[in-house]
């Protein structure tokens, strides 16, 4: 056994032993590999010196038609991704313990503001496949220090097709415990042009936990209960000639609360102060409804013979409006807390840009990928406050507009980058790759009157206030990567990879904070966090990876050990949810992998994927466990599948493990360790192919386990006591839920 591991992972032994193994495996032949467009170099997974996963349409359909949400499906199938919080957003969901970038057809959905709505972006009905690159990457700029997800949409076919889907699920917890979905798409064309138009709609009802109690609506990141989702998407392809092609993707997406249901906070906000229990109510009357609304358009031109090179050019535009749930703010001191205001924020982003990528092969052994990227983003946010007296009397059910203020400083972000990536085949076994990306980023921050001071002026407690000065700042970053890939056989590769990632922390939560003194009705600015005095520093991550993959007829596996080190850390100020950037280094290391086995001459299959992870921060020269506010727990999933004839059955399990810390080192004299408890869920998914169409069925949380989600354990740490009782933010997982779905393609 030792020799086998040394042979796989030691480069010196690889050079001596791999030629023999290559010759022995020639007869087997290599399985066709899907090209990963997210690599920007038209390479397949077998040609990449980095952990890469491709979730194909059959896997997506099995999970989604079995009732899984996009976030839940990804957490089940991507080893390095954290478990889902089951809410609207992916806040707190990391890859390999760090932030991830999400794209649709190569257009990134991440903005400078870390709003975490990237996975509240598309109905899975419109997804063809999903590409995943684990670990830090600079292929598409900053923000992907933990990994990259590229959602590839369905495109039109030459032959005429109609696709229909209808389904629903329920836990039989009450009359409102039911979700429904319906979707339709039509596509067609000819040799020169094709297109697809789709409309999908999802309605969510109430959710109940394993004990039959209704799950509270998430009033922090907003929940999915009692909401609706509409996704309208059109794609078109025009083949100009044998080498040139145009592709167009347009989308309108809206996911929003139904406007009738909300969180009852008790008379005089008794549930906020801990004197009563909150519960969901259907009597909401609010002037602001939480949700996500997005428009996206993407035009791509490709030419496979541009001066002897492959050329891909993209121009794109995205705008989005993110609205949050009405949120109380406490004042006073324990035990005499009281609610001083209740409001809801709305944040708007406009984003446009372009990319140019060329792939060339100057000589047979050398492949070059190079190009330029340019992007511009503008951001603004406001906070709508509601009539406090009416909100108190109704327990937060009657929310009439009283006044509005700015929530964060408005700003723009511009990026201009060039990159060069090279891949050289040293011999039939070894491929050396490396590259560099240089990116220039400019931030322009507007002047901003402090958030609390704006409230005081709006309520008449003050007449004026100094503005915290804005300004302009820029960043210059050169990010490098290098890798060595060894083709042990046609079916087996091992690699070592080094890559750098970069992120600029959330400027909205960093700038615009100040200390004021009230003098005669005027707030005088004493000190502040501003561009001139305290520039927001970027965070660079160095990531290392040693991996191995094997793709056989029966056994398929990919395993990688990883280590990443960042030069700084982000800390959350729980009094106002702003951030600080500290000089504390952060290291994250672990083992990520997946194993699938298809039993020979059988309809059975089994598999597992896992991510064993540890996160640490260096404080005062000593490595400590990363606080559970942001630390990722280890995770393992497993499944058994049986697919005889027209049947396809799957039993799958997901286990997340405990994660703990040594106390909140951002607070003085804090030594009490904290823990997020792990839990296990079991799902049964199945389908049967009918003479016309397919029927899918599922039982999620098969054992009806009662548990608190990772986010439901993390939210009280972040929001309580500043924003109310911890019970207000303790979100349970959904109990046993039955699903039924019918789909047909003709």
Where do the language-model regions lie?
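Short acidic/polar hinge/loop motifs at secondary-structure boundaries
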Residues: 107-134, 184, 234
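Gram-negative outer-membrane beta-barrel transporters
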Residues: 165, 425-432, 441, 551-575, ...
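Extracytoplasmic beta-strand/coil segments of soluble accessory domains associated
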Residues: 37, 71-108, 128
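Membrane-embedded beta-barrel scaffold of Gram-negative outer-membrane proteins
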Residues: 300-304, 308-328, 487, 493-499, ...
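A beta-strand signature from Gram-negative outer-membrane beta-barrel systems
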Residues: 122-165, 745
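Transmembrane beta-barrel wall of Gram-negative outer-membrane proteins
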Residues: 175-204, 213-260, 293-304, 361-366, ...
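C-terminal beta-signal and adjacent terminal beta-strands/loops
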Residues: 502, 657-664, 687-746
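Face-selective signature of the C-terminal outer-membrane beta-barrel domain
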Residues: 239, 243-253, 288-454, 485-487, ...
């Amino acid at each position: 056994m030792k020799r086998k591991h040394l042979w796989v992972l030691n480069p010196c032994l690889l050079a001596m032993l791999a030629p023999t193994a290559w010759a022995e495996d020639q007869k087997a032949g290599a399985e066709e590999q899907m090209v990963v467009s997210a690599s920007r170099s038209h390479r397949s997974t077998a040609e990449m010196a980095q952990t890469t996963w491709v979730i194909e349409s059959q896997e997506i359909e099995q999970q989604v038609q079995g009732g899984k949400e996009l976030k839940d499906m990804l957490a089940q199938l991507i080893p390095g991704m954290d478990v889902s919080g089951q809410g609207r957003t992916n806040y707190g969901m990391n890859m390999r313990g760090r932030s991830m970038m999400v794209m649709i057809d190569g257009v990134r959905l991440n903005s400078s503001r870390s709003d975490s709505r990237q996975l509240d972006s598309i109905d899975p009905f419109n997804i063809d496949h999903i590409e995943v690159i684990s670990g830090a990457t600079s292929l598409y700029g900053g923000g992907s220090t933990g990994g990259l997800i590229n959602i590839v949409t369905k495109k039109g076919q030459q032959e005429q097709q109609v696709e229909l889907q209808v389904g629903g699920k329920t836990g039989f917890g009450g009359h409102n415990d039911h979700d429904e979905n319906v979707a339709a798409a039509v596509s067609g064309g000819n040799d020169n042009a094709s297109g697809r138009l789709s409309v999908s709609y999802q309605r969510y009802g109430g959710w109940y936990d394993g004990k039959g109690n209704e799950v509270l609506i998430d009033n922090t990141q907003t929940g999915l209960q009692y909401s609706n989702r509409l996704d309208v998407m059109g794609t078109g392809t025009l083949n100009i000639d044998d080498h040139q092609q145009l592709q167009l993707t347009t989308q309108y997406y809206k996911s929003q609360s139904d406007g009738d249901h909300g969180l009852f906070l008790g008379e005089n906000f008794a549930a906020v102060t801990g004197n009563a229990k909150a519960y969901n109510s259907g009597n909401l009357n609010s002037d602001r409804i939480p949700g996500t609304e997005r428009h996206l358009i993407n035009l791509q031109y490709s030419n496979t013979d541009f001066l002897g090179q492959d050329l891909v050019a993209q121009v794109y535009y995205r705008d989005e409006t993110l609205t949050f749930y009405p949120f109380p703010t406490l004042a006073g001191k324990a035990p005499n807390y009281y609610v001083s205001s209740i409001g809801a924020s709305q944040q708007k982003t406009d984003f446009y840009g372009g990319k140019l990528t060329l792939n060339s092969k100057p000589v047979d052994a050398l492949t070059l990928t190079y190009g330029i990227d340019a992007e511009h983003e503008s951001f603004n946010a406001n906070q709508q406050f509601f009539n406090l007296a009416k909100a108190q009397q109704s327990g937060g059910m009657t929310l009439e507009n009283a006044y509005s203020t700015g929530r964060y400083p408005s700003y723009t972000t511009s990026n201009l980058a060039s990159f060069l990536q090279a891949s050289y085949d040293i011999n039939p076994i070894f491929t050396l790759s490396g590259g560099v990306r240089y990116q220039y980023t400019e931030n322009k921050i507007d002047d901003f009157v402090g958030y609390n001071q704006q409230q005081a002026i709006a309520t008449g407690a003050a007449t004026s206030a100094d503005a915290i000065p804005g300004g302009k700042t820029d960043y210059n970053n050169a990010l490098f990567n290098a890798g060595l890939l060894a083709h042990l056989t046609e079916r087996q590769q091992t690699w070592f990879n080094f890559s750098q990632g970069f992120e600029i922390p959330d400027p909205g939560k960093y700038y615009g904070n100040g200390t004021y003194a009230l003098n005669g009705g005027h707030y005088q600015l004493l000190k502040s966090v501003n561009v001139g005095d305290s520039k927001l520093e970027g965070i660079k991550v160095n990531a290392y990876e040693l991996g191995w993959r094997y793709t056989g007829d029966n056994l398929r596996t990919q395993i990688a050990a990883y280590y990443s080190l960042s030069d700084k850390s982000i800390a959350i100020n729980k009094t106002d949810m702003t951030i600080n950037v500290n000089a504390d280094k952060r290291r994250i290391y672990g083992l990520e992998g997946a194993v699938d086995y298809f039993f020979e001459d059988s309809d059975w299959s089994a598999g597992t994927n896992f991510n064993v992870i540890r996160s640490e921060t260096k404080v005062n020269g000593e490595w400590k466990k990363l606080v559970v506010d942001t630390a990722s727990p280890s995770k393992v999933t497993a499944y058994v599948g049986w697919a005889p004839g027209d049947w396809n059955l799957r039993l799958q399990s997901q286990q997340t493990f405990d994660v703990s810390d040594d106390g909140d080192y951002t607070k003085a004299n804090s030594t009490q360790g904290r823990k997020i408890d792990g839990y296990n869920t079991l799902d049964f998914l199945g389908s049967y192919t009918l003479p016309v169409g397919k029927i899918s069925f599922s039982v999620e949380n098969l054992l009806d386990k009662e548990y608190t989600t990772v986010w439901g354990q993390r939210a009280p740490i972040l929001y309580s006591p500043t924003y109310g009782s911890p019970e207000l933010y303790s979100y349970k997982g959904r109990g046993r839920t039955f699903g039924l779905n019918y789909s047909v393609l003709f």
